[in-house]
Curated annotation (Swiss-Prot):
[4Fe-4S] cluster 1 binds at residues 113, 116, 119, 162. It is an enzyme of class 7 (translocase). GO terms for molecular function: 4 iron, 4 sulfur cluster binding; metal ion binding; NADH dehydrogenase (ubiquinone) activity. This is Probable NADH dehydrogenase [ubiquinone] iron-sulfur protein 8, mitochondrial. Belongs to the complex I 23 kDa subunit family. It catalyses: a ubiquinone + NADH + 5 H(+)(in) = a ubiquinol + NAD(+) + 4 H(+)(out). Binds 2 [4Fe-4S] cluster. The keyword NAD applies. Core subunit of the mitochondrial membrane respiratory chain NADH dehydrogenase (Complex I) that is believed to belong to the minimal assembly required for catalysis. Complex I functions in the transfer of electrons from NADH to the respiratory chain. The immediate electron acceptor for the enzyme is believed to be ubiquinone. Its EC number is 7.1.1.2.
Length: 212
């Protein structure tokens, strides 16, 4: 009964019972003074005083929240938009952006990958599979380089581990597919990505060389 009487005080000017009745039903040591509370901004309920009741009633009668929100809306009409019209407009990407994978070549056209398999070993998702063979000149090159893009978590560890900057994550993030098989990248697909994005890849690596 004591809790119910105190709660009635918060219902506003139209639902309150006389204060003396509520106080009489509650022990004096359980009553907290209204001065202990501070209403900030737009009040959602009355604070129990006559001024609070009047303020609460005016806000409900004249819909001040509605007009205040309308004013905020009008202010944003003349502000610069915070969004872009994607996909017709695209925002800038960081040089550290990690997108679709690619295998790079040297300017001579020779593949950079030396089949050290460091990327395969460090991949936490075990998404990379590499097979290699030794050439007559003693160098090693990959015969198979597969990445299961459905497993990849885009951590960038493969790129960090590569000693010759062969495997990188490029700027492309628009490569959604309709089938699972299209996300199983082989060596030819990765080299094609590298040829396509080489200018951007080289520029990004150069921009970040001090931090690698």
């Amino acid at each position: 009964m004591a809790m119910k009487s105190v709660a009635v005080l918060t219902k506003g000017m139209f639902g309150r019972i006389p204060a003396q009745l509520a106080v009489s039903s509650v022990p004096s040591n359980t009553i907290q003074k209204r001065s202990n509370y501070k209403f900030v901004g737009m009040p959602n309920e009355t604070d129990g005083t006559l001024a609070g009741d009047l303020n609460y009633g005016l806000h409900n009668v004249f819909f001040t929240e509605l007009f205040r929100g309308f004013g905020v809306m009008l202010g944003h009409v003349f502000m610069e938009p915070a969004t872009i019209n994607y996909p017709f407009e695209k925002g800038p990407l960081s040089s550290r952006f990690r997108g679709e994978h690619a295998l790079r070549r040297y300017p001579s056209g020779e593949e950079r990958c030396i089949a050290c398999k460091l990327c395969e070993a460090i991949c936490p998702a075990q998404a990379i599979t590499i097979e290699a063979e030794t050439r007559p000149d003693g160098s090693r090159r990959t015969t198979r380089y597969d990445i299961d893009m459905t497993k990849c978590i885009y951590c960038g560890l493969c790129q960090e581990a590569c000693p010759v900057d062969a495997i990188v994550e490029g700027p492309n993030f628009e490569y959604s597919t309709e089938t699972h098989e299209e996300l199983l990248y082989n060596k030819e697909k990765l080299l094609l990505n590298g040829d396509r994005w080489e200018p951007e890849l080289a520029s990004n690596l150069q921009a970040e060389y001090l931090y690698r």
